[in-house]
Protein backbone atom coordinates (compact mmCIF):
# COMPACT_ATOMS: atom_id res chain seq x y z
CA UNK A 1 0.00 0.00 0.00
CA UNK A 2 1.14 3.52 -0.77
CA UNK A 3 0.42 6.82 0.92
CA UNK A 4 -1.87 9.11 -1.09
CA UNK A 5 0.82 11.51 -2.33
CA UNK A 6 3.16 8.74 -3.50
CA UNK A 7 0.28 7.00 -5.29
CA UNK A 8 -0.65 10.19 -7.19
CA UNK A 9 2.98 10.84 -8.14
CA UNK A 10 3.39 7.27 -9.42
CA UNK A 11 0.22 7.59 -11.48
CA UNK A 12 1.57 10.78 -13.06
CA UNK A 13 4.88 9.01 -13.74
CA UNK A 14 3.04 6.12 -15.42
CA UNK A 15 1.24 8.59 -17.71
CA UNK A 16 4.52 10.34 -18.51
CA UNK A 17 6.15 7.03 -19.47
CA UNK A 18 3.12 6.03 -21.53
CA UNK A 19 3.22 9.31 -23.47
CA UNK A 20 7.00 9.23 -23.92
CA UNK A 21 7.37 5.57 -24.91
CA UNK A 22 4.04 4.99 -26.72
CA UNK A 23 3.65 1.59 -25.08
CA UNK A 24 0.62 -0.51 -24.26
CA UNK A 25 -0.18 -0.83 -20.57
CA UNK A 26 -2.70 -3.10 -18.88
CA UNK A 27 -3.46 -1.94 -15.36
CA UNK A 28 -5.58 -3.98 -12.97
CA UNK A 29 -7.09 -1.94 -10.15
CA UNK A 30 -10.08 -1.80 -7.84
CA UNK A 31 -9.73 2.01 -7.65
CA UNK A 32 -12.22 3.61 -10.04
CA UNK A 33 -10.56 7.05 -9.84
CA UNK A 34 -7.24 5.46 -10.78
CA UNK A 35 -8.85 3.61 -13.69
CA UNK A 36 -10.43 6.79 -15.10
CA UNK A 37 -7.23 8.79 -14.58
CA UNK A 38 -4.90 6.27 -16.23
CA UNK A 39 -7.09 4.40 -18.68
CA UNK A 40 -8.09 4.85 -22.28
CA UNK A 41 -10.70 2.17 -21.63
CA UNK A 42 -12.08 0.89 -18.34
CA UNK A 43 -13.36 -2.67 -18.32
CA UNK A 44 -15.70 -3.62 -15.48
CA UNK A 45 -15.58 -7.35 -14.89
CA UNK A 46 -18.49 -9.42 -13.67
CA UNK A 47 -18.26 -11.43 -10.49
CA UNK A 48 -18.11 -14.54 -12.68
CA UNK A 49 -14.47 -15.14 -13.72
CA UNK A 50 -13.61 -13.93 -17.20
CA UNK A 51 -16.96 -12.22 -17.86
CA UNK A 52 -16.94 -8.58 -18.93
CA UNK A 53 -19.88 -6.59 -17.62
CA UNK A 54 -19.16 -3.32 -19.44
CA UNK A 55 -16.43 -1.47 -21.36
CA UNK A 56 -16.14 2.31 -21.05
CA UNK A 57 -14.11 4.48 -23.41
CA UNK A 58 -12.40 7.34 -21.59
CA UNK A 59 -12.30 10.22 -24.03
CA UNK A 60 -10.63 12.90 -21.92
CA UNK A 61 -7.27 14.17 -23.08
CA UNK A 62 -4.12 13.47 -21.09
CA UNK A 63 -3.15 14.83 -18.63
CA UNK A 64 -6.52 14.57 -16.96
CA UNK A 65 -7.91 16.95 -14.39
CA UNK A 66 -9.25 14.96 -11.44
CA UNK A 67 -11.37 17.96 -10.41
CA UNK A 68 -13.12 18.43 -13.78
CA UNK A 69 -16.83 17.77 -14.26
CA UNK A 70 -16.08 15.34 -17.10
CA UNK A 71 -13.75 13.28 -14.91
CA UNK A 72 -16.41 13.05 -12.18
CA UNK A 73 -19.16 12.28 -14.70
CA UNK A 74 -17.19 9.34 -16.10
CA UNK A 75 -16.17 8.14 -12.65
CA UNK A 76 -19.75 8.28 -11.36
CA UNK A 77 -21.05 6.36 -14.38
CA UNK A 78 -18.53 3.55 -13.79
CA UNK A 79 -19.11 3.64 -10.03
CA UNK A 80 -22.85 3.04 -10.53
CA UNK A 81 -22.16 0.05 -12.80
CA UNK A 82 -19.47 -1.32 -10.49
CA UNK A 83 -21.79 -1.35 -7.48
CA UNK A 84 -24.99 -2.23 -9.35
CA UNK A 85 -26.91 -4.98 -7.63
CA UNK A 86 -28.05 -7.64 -10.05
CA UNK A 87 -31.60 -8.83 -9.64
CA UNK A 88 -31.78 -12.56 -9.06
CA UNK A 89 -34.89 -14.48 -10.07
CA UNK A 90 -36.64 -16.27 -7.25
CA UNK A 91 -35.83 -19.97 -7.44
CA UNK A 92 -36.37 -22.88 -5.13
CA UNK A 93 -35.99 -26.63 -5.15
CA UNK A 94 -38.27 -29.27 -3.68
Feature map (PLM): residue ranges:
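Short coil-to-helix N-cap segments within the nucleotide-binding domains
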Residues: 1-2, 6
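Short proline/glycine- and basic residue-enriched helix-capping loop/turn segments at helix->loop/beta transitions
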Residues: 11, 75-81
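Conserved catalytic segment of ABC-fold P-loop ATPases
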Residues: 37-44
